[in-house]
Amino acid sequence: MKLFISCVLGLLFCAQAHAQLLIAPTRFVLDADTSVTEKIVVENNSDQPIRLEIKPIYRPIKATGLVRTDANVTESENIANWIKVSPPIIRELKPNQRRTVRLRMNALPDDMPDGEYRAYLWFSPIAKAKELSELDLSAKGQSNNGSAFQLNFHINSYVPVYVQKGKQVQDVKFTCENQSLTIRNDGNFQFNAKLNVDDHSEKLVLLRNAELSKSFPIGSKVSLLQDEQSLHECIL
């Protein structure tokens, strides 16, 4: 089974390491035909205890020039209902403390169409409120009635979970016009290739049932390669 690429045009929602929480691994690529249990390690690297909520969710992809061509794609590719996490809530994770969270992915039903499916594990850390002493008042601030307050913030993180069912089949069309390259992926599997524009190269990944339009300066020489084989060339 091919490995999935965890970011779509640099805009897929990759897991983040920030001031409160470290998460490993940062993505999962799982087999659709087998029920599996995986481990996730979370670590609180802030200076105060946090409460951590974890749950499987689906998130739509939004990017400039990207359109999903399947109106029901949310239902088509969403596997959040096949994922369970334990524990779903860690009531207190102390500074520098690590905990193991287990992800259970159930095998997809045999009658589900071949294709690629995805969901995300949503991690929501919230700093736990703590009492402030009188010595803290100058550093932490005071409210209008003289009582101490502390402003806490949290940043959600997302770990992608990908599943591929069946043998990959490609159904992609290319169009060059009006200074734009348009790639339409009508298949149920993601499309990936190397995009060359003049002297610049980048990895391009397009999700299933999606169309992407990218604009370039007039006269740009554009080519798409996959496994060193030319897929399409044009001059805009």
Predicted feature locations:
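Intrinsically disordered, low-complexity segments enriched in serine, threonine, and glycine
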Residues: 170-236
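N-terminal signal peptide c-region/cleavage motif recognized by signal peptidases
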Residues: 14-16
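Short, acidic/polar linear motifs in exposed loop/turn regions
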Residues: 46-48, 109, 127, 184-189
